[in-house]
Amino acid sequence: MLRSIGVPAADIARSWANVAVPGRMEDVSAGYPVRVLVDYAHTPDAVERALTAARGQGRLIAVIGAGGDRDRGKRPEMGALAARLADGVWITDDNPRSEDPAAIRAAVREGVMTVPGDLRAEVRETGDRARAIHEAISAAHPGDVVAILGKGHESGQDVAGVVTEFDDR
């Protein structure tokens, strides 16, 4: 449509470079010596794509969880992908809803443990999502990337039917 009204293709391409979708590979690095990305990746395919896209020159650290009252089968797969594609993984809560948060984290960790030790990222676990994010960023060095996956643009954490204000950004 823009081309039909005479806008040059180069101008259209430059404009698209500035388009950002909140919670989709959103760079929230301001104030940090490392690159910090927030992404809504909450399926195995999305986790794989986000971590592959986030890979930079330094280490890649992933903060990951899985939603409760959702597809339980994807949890181990997401854990395995994170353990294989990242250099460090923090397993944490991501809207456990009515499920036991520790059981969800255990399912993610189960997938992590399927990755052979020499190929597996260093893994840590904490149910406190804010703490996991803080620890992951603190463990990163200049040149590293921290990918915080699962919540993206969401502004709340649902635990046992109570939604508290929380934003990964």
Where are these regions (language model features)?
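ATP-dependent carboxylate-amine ligase
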Residues: 1-169
